[in-house]
């Protein structure tokens, strides 16, 4: 059955898992202990069709969507195959790792609750079998950190995105920015403390423990003294002033992924406009025209940007010296190669 499955699609197994440490996402040969990434990028990469034309932005988007549609069901089927083996011949480390890979894939699509469930399943196996398999014993600290990160991100989505308000996720967290839905940060603190009990030298997890407590209004007293960061760690000697979040009122409140921004006067009316790109290969670049009075109106389609998909970064330049500011969009560098774009401005912001 497993052989048939392997002919249908890629499967994340011991033979083809991403070229990183079995449990830790630290690159081989490095000496530092870094926080475990919960993104699923490496895992989804196994399912991406690398042969797609990097010059065709639309087919790259389609390939990513196909990979997402394939990855989770394929891994779930592989897990069923592993669990169908007789109890005495099961590879529990491989079963735990498959739960972990499913958790990463769920994280990739933004389902952090389901991601945490899969990480937790791997963690329970590691706890139960640690005495018989050193791989599972070694898995406990990184899994604890991974579960904590997944829950912290879940809390961020539930409070900073789904329940967004002006003070959401502005660091350091003040009273108005505290989480109203608290289970994410509460569970994160639980697993960060478990991790620190095993690896007290991990400063990144210690930092995240204090951050999680801050989102709940429990810093500093809610953090055990041994792990408590001093208050000066969250303050600055500089005084840059205060910036209020006004994106919603300005017409700029959109939800997307990280990307680039190039702010310039693209239509020559004397007011600066905003061009943004997104690392999501299925999301188009956007152009917001400054309408004056602190308000912006979207002109993405009118500017011919609907098919300008993806973009790690963007910068403005007048490449042809016609006096109109153009935009250069840079892509690729993560999951797959993608072409760049040089967008010529016709002088009307198009």
Show which residues each predicted segment covers.
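Helix-turn-helix repeat elements of alpha-solenoid scaffolds
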Residues: 63-81, 111-125, 181-189, 237
